[in-house]
Amino acid sequence: MSKSKPFTIRLSEEVGSWLERENRRTRLPKSALLEILAEESIRTRRFPGIGFRGPEHARRAWVIGTALDVWELVELYEGKGAERVLSEHNASERQLDLALSYYETYPREIDEALEENAREPEEWHEISPSVIPSPPKSG
């Protein structure tokens, strides 16, 4: 997130208390927490049907009503086409269109997730050897 002008805000006691707890839990500055919340709120208003999930350091856009993140629907669409995605996965045409519209607006975010998921098994094992088993040796 880019630097912006200082902004003063008065918060309700409830919101202030919540920010204090989240600040202690996440160790993120309250201003960063508010910026994250504002960004997600703006995106959910621009794209009704999109929500966010995951830990603070790796929040992901997902399509509400499906089990799929936006990047997963985009990956399925690019690999199978709309007709197969709609017939083989729990997503409506509206939900697929929503994911594609979100991708069109935030391509960098989704492309990064697609790239991350495209890693080879050997690379995943190198990153997390205790979680990802060694790929079988050929030959």
How does the language model describe each region?
Residues 48-52, 108-118:
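Short Lys/Arg-enriched helix C-cap and helix-to-coil transition segments
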Residues 56-64, 114-139:
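Intrinsically disordered, low-complexity basic tails/linkers immediately adjacent to helix-turn-helix/homeobox/MYB/SANT
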